Regions:
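Short amphipathic beta-strand starts and helix->beta connectors
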Residues: 41-53, 83-84, 119-126, 202, ...
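Anionic-ligand-binding alpha/beta catalytic cores of soluble enzymes and soluble regulatory domains
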Residues: 137-217
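Acidic, proline/glycine-enriched N-terminal capping motif
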Residues: 1-53
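Residue-level signal for inorganic ion chemistry
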Residues: 15, 65, 198, 234
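Acidic, low-complexity central loop/insert segments
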Residues: 2-12, 55-163
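Glycine-rich, small/acidic residue-mixed loop/short-helix segments
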Residues: 181-189, 203-286
Length: 286
């Protein structure tokens, strides 16, 4: 199946200092990303909270950033604050779009080890990016991409949810550190590169085991929305990041407390949410 994915927007980054600048701002090794390859990356606050996660594509003469459409303007506004004398230009590409391509029999594919870069190829000016979960992004002019198909978009979202690939949007920015979103597993964080905003917090969380929340797939009886609270009784226990429809309700990718993994979960309205899958390990009770 193929469909345009209106969730995503595209930014072109050009100028002689583009790789150096992004290397110092993002969580992955952009400086050593080869032409014709792509990677996942996060842009974080100084406190390590994820402002946006993205795919970075090196086209040789420039870089493309694929992120949530509703984050494009706020992220560019923040990045431009730090350009100063660097030779780098950010340009949102309004005539570009992103499509998803997925085999009809594709199975959910969870990350086993970080994939810090993956192949991309130019096919008649449409860049095809082979994502680690077996789906493909197609990035190019809107008229060159497959049309929008709601059922196919939902199938794409289900595949990413069940594979553990979260996407931050305006409703969920600054709610989680990278590890809570599985970025250390899928390859969105390079732990041996230099400093970037939030690097100290993210590294400390990784090596001192300070992360107390992680991704989970939750089944609900109705359609949820990004940013909806997950609760245990009256207490906050997490937040829904992404959602997709099923025949009997929804599947939702949420960040939840480790301690809530075996509890009775609900959304903010009291609707039951059932844990289908955890992307973290719960220590057995003694």
């Amino acid at each position: 199946m193929q469909t345009c994915l209106p969730f995503f927007g595209v930014v072109r980054v050009s100028g002689d200092d583009r790789a150096d600048f992004l290397h110092n701002q993002l969580s992955n090794d952009i400086l050593n990303l080869p032409s014709g390859q792509a990677c996942y990356a996060t842009y974080n606050t100084a406190k390590g909270r994820v402002l946006a996660n993205m795919v970075v594509l090196n086209r040789g003469d420039d870089l493309l950033l694929v992120m949530a459409q509703d984050l494009v303007e706020p992220i560019l506004k923040k990045l431009r604050m730090y350009v100063l004398r660097a030779k780098v230009v950010f340009e949102p590409l309004a005539d570009f779009a992103v499509a998803g391509e997925l085999a009809d029999d594709a199975k959910a594919t969870t990350a086993v080890e970080p994939n810090l870069a993956f192949a991309a190829e130019n096919q008649n000016n449409v860049w095809c990016i082979n994502l680690p979960h077996t789906g493909r992004f197609k990035v190019g002019l809107s008229e060159q991409l497959p049309p929008y198909d709601a059922a196919a978009e939902n199938a794409w979202n289900l595949h990413e949810i069940c594979s553990g690939y979260a996407w931050i949007s305006l409703a969920t920015k600054e709610t989680a550190v990278a590890q809570m979103l599985n970025q250390h597993i899928i390859g969105g964080v390079h732990f041996r590169k230099g400093c970037y905003p939030g690097q100290e917090i993210i590294a400390r969380a990784q090596y001192r085991g300070q992360v107390k929340r992680g991704l989970a797939v939750l089944r609900g009886s109705s359609l949820e929305a990004a940013g909806i609270a997950v609760k245990v009784g009256e207490e906050e226990a997490g937040q829904i990041i992404n959602t997709a429809l099923t025949d009997d309700g929804s599947l939702n990718l949420a960040v939840i407390k480790f301690s809530a993994a075996e509890a009775a979960l609900t959304d903010a309205d009291g609707n039951a949410l059932t844990v289908e899958q955890l992307f973290f390990t719960v220590e057995p009770k003694e």
